[in-house]
């Protein structure tokens, strides 16, 4: 029996809605990254984008365990000499774009390259409870019910 390899034309993508309120950031990101890659499917093929489309709402209400809320630092470089910048998770979550914490956590769990960039385009993250994908009728995934540790204490 030959190994099954899915073709891009055979891929069936579902829409999944996840409410991130009260969920632990790393656990949420792991579940979403696996969904985006398609690793939850029996038809997973490493070189084909066969993951689902994921919509995350309430990304600003995600929970970081321990002292990560104040101590976790995000670094980036402007490209200019001496251009290293940093922000704490607290500054980002209380800033203009709190959904970036969730986006970066997921992005850094997806392999880098053309396929990873294509898979990241299947992710939509919203800071509030409203989203623009009602027309796709996303199926709700209760991440908190998958494992009791997925729900944060804060």
Curated annotation (Swiss-Prot):
This is Large ribosomal subunit protein uL13. Gene3D superfamilies: Ribosomal protein L13. Keywords: Ribonucleoprotein, Ribosomal protein. CDD domains: Ribosomal_L13. This protein is one of the early assembly proteins of the 50S ribosomal subunit, although it is not seen to bind rRNA by itself. It is important during the early stages of 50S assembly. It comes from the Bacteria. GO terms for molecular function: mRNA binding; structural constituent of ribosome. GO terms for biological process: negative regulation of translation; translation.
